[in-house]
Structure formats: structure tokens, C-alpha cells
């Protein structure tokens, strides 16, 4: 990777974080930014043709969720054997398409959190009876200096809503227990937030390694929390991801 070029595709709040970390890790490397916004930043490009000239080996797609599929198609049609990291969620809906030319990764980085690694190790050979997973936050506090009702999170047609925005919970539940089977779910817009995407989700299902799984998500909790409760035979675990604490009994 020493001489490979990096491209950040899109330049919102998450992309800014990626650039910050990459600059720190690789201070001498050229990091290109693709954005149609008129922003003053080094190595910015605003035409897709320029990407073909740059020939990046590593790409991070940080565009709006609704654009992820067409953005990936662009790289699929024009590049081979490059590494592409797509910010979660991968898509806003299911597409019947198989990508073959490049390696594609999705940014579900919670799997690498030490607490999550601890839980994964502890439940490896256990049958969990019940899993209660909860994540509540307040959308207006998510992005500094940006009006929340102008962000993609507030707009259903741009891939916003708690189901996609907070899909880390569905990802790590699948990672822990296997493919989820839905029994029922309640998804709604219930608060007074100025958005047209859903701000509430209550999912109930099961998986191979857990009989009962509930996942609760919302955009309107003034006091944020991210909690996991797992219960089984001679086993009880509570994890608080925001406070980076876990208790095992």
C-alpha cells in the first residue's frame, strides 16, 4: 500500500474522519477526494473521468446510501482488483447483482471493538436463550454545525432512517448468532423530529444460536445508550458500549 493511491468518494462528516485517520497513518501518501461540492481541499476532483486518470488502488465510498449501488457499478465497470470500503449501510434496498472485479468491504467496524470481540469469544460455544439489544440516540446531536433535517438521515428517499443508519445492531447480532429470522417488527415515525424517515424500530426474531432476539432502535433519545443483554444457562452478560463496560455473571 506504500505507493498506492487512495480515493475518498464523497466528502461528508464520515469522509472527513476517514481523511483525518488516513493522513495520520500515511502522512506522505496522496489522498484524493471526489466531491461535486465546492470545497477548498487539497487533491480534490469533481469529475468521474479524473478518477480514471488517478487509478486509485484503495477507495472509500462515503456518498449517500441511495447512491452506493451506482457508485459501486462505476468502479466495477472501470477497475479491477482494487479494494473498496463502503460506508454502512451497503445499500438502501436489495439489488440482484454480483460484483466480481474488486474486493468490497462494508464499514461495520463495531465488530472490531474490544467489547464486541470479548462477547464473541465468550458466546462461541454457548446457546443463548435471549438477546436484548438497544440503541437510542438523538439525531439533532449527530452532526455538529449541520441542521439535522437537511441531512440524508432525515430523508427516507436518500436512505435515511434508524433501520439503515443504526444497522450496526443488525450486523453484530448476525455475527453473534447467525442469520436472523424475523418474527415481527414495528417501524414507524413517532417523534416530533422534522424528518420523513422512520425514527423508531422494534424488531423481534430468532437465529441458530439464539432463540429470542429483540433489537430496539430510535433517533429521539436525549440520553444516548447502546446496550446488550445476553441470557443463557448459567450465563448473563450486560454490555454498555458507550461506557465501554461489560459485566459477565
Q: What does each model-found stretch correspond to?
A:
Residues 113-184:
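Predominantly a Rossmann-like dinucleotide-binding segment in NAD(P)-dependent oxidoreductases
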Residues 51-71:
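Rossmann-like NAD(P)-binding element
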Residues 164-165, 170-243:
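Contiguous beta-strand/loop segments that form the cofactor/metal-binding neighborhood of enzyme cores
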Residues 1-41:
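N-terminal Rossmann-like dinucleotide-binding module
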